[in-house]
From Swiss-Prot:
This is Internal scaffolding protein VP3. It comes from Bdellovibrio phage phiMH2K. Residues 122-137 have a biased composition (Polar residues). InterPro entries: Chlamydia_phage_Vp3 (IPR014131). It holds the Pfam family Chlamy_scaf.
């Protein structure tokens, strides 16, 4: 609720009054006081107010901004919704179930038969020799520059 006072010079002074009970738990006030934390550390040598779990850290630099992520999710949902009803039912109408299915290599043949994947033939490559092949050239005559070895 706002309380408005009119000052003698004609300007208004607006106070915001919160009549709701406070949402903070005052019983933790002492534990949050830096002076109390330091005194307790000096006395016991322990810092007990820290989290008891190890933090989780990761490289998040490749994650797009929130809007881009939401657009990606929306496009994925729309693509899933365009599948035939019997196929959506096969995955319990859940894009997550479909993703789990497609990520499992054991399901590759079924995914191809359902038309969710295409069979891609990998070209056969000639076996490469693992031995080092070096070419030897006769030593240069005196006064000639030494050639750079070729790999």
């Amino acid at each position: 609720m706002k309380k408005i006072e009119l000052r003698p010079n004609g300007t208004k002074l607006v106070h915001t009054v919160n009549e709701l009970p406070p949402e903070t738990d005052q019983s933790f006030g002492k534990e949050c006081d830096i002076n109390f934390i330091v005194k307790k550390f000096i006395k016991t040598g322990q810092i007990t107010h820290l989290a008891r779990r190890q933090g989780f850290y990761g490289d998040q630099s490749s994650i797009p901004d929130f809007q881009t992520a939401m657009d990606t999710v929306t496009k994925a949902q729309q693509a899933f919704d365009e599948l035939p009803a019997h196929m959506r039912k096969r995955f319990a109408n859940s894009p997550h179930e479909l993703m789990q299915f497609l990520q499992d290599p054991k399901n590759r043949d079924e995914a191809i038969s359902l038309g969710l994947m295409e069979m891609v033939e990998t070209p056969q490559q000639a076996p490469q020799s693992t031995t080092n092949q070096t070419t030897t050239k006769p030593a240069p005559a005196s006064g000639e520059p030494t050639p750079v070895p070729t790999p």
